Swiss-Prot record:
Name of this chain's protein: Serine palmitoyltransferase small subunit A
InterPro entries: Ser_palmitoyltrfase_ssu-like, SPT_small_subunit
Keywords: Endoplasmic reticulum, Lipid metabolism, Membrane, Sphingolipid metabolism, Transmembrane, Transmembrane helix
Subunit structure: Component of the serine palmitoyltransferase (SPT) complex, which is composed of SPTLC1, SPTLC2 or SPTLC3 and SPTSSA or SPTSSB. The heterodimer consisting of SPTLC1 and SPTLC2/SPTLC3 forms the catalytic core of the enzyme, while SPTSSA or SPTSSB subunits determine substrate specificity. SPT also interacts with ORMDL proteins, especially ORMDL3, which negatively regulate SPT activity in the presence of ceramides.
Segments passing through the bilayer: 10-26, 32-54
Gene Ontology terms describing biological process: ceramide biosynthetic process
Cytoplasmic side of membrane: 1-9, 55-68
Subcellular location: Endoplasmic reticulum membrane
Disulfide-linked positions: none
Stated family: Belongs to the SPTSS family. SPTSSA subfamily.
UniProt topological domain (Lumenal) ranges: 27-31
Length: 68
């Protein structure tokens, strides 16, 4: 029963996502392209944050002389 409830909840979130982004009006292939682009941009943002954030944090800490 828990799997069914979780599936209903995920379906509800996906339906809300379609409504908020107006993707329900698109063809399935257009929706796939949009979702692929969205996931690609999000993945690049996470990767960029992972790679460059430590450098920026260390520069800030050196600037405020927290770390020598």
């Amino acid at each position: 029963m828990a799997f069914g409830d979780a599936w209903k909840q995920l379906s509800w979130f996906y339906y809300q996502y379609l409504l908020v982004t107006a993707l329900y009006m698109l063809e399935p292939w257009e929706r796939t392209i949009f979702n692929s682009l969205l996931i690609s941009v999000a993945a690049m943002a996470v990767y960029t944050g992972y790679v460059f954030m430590p450098q920026h944090i260390m520069a800030i800490l050196h600037y405020f002389e927290v770390v020598q």
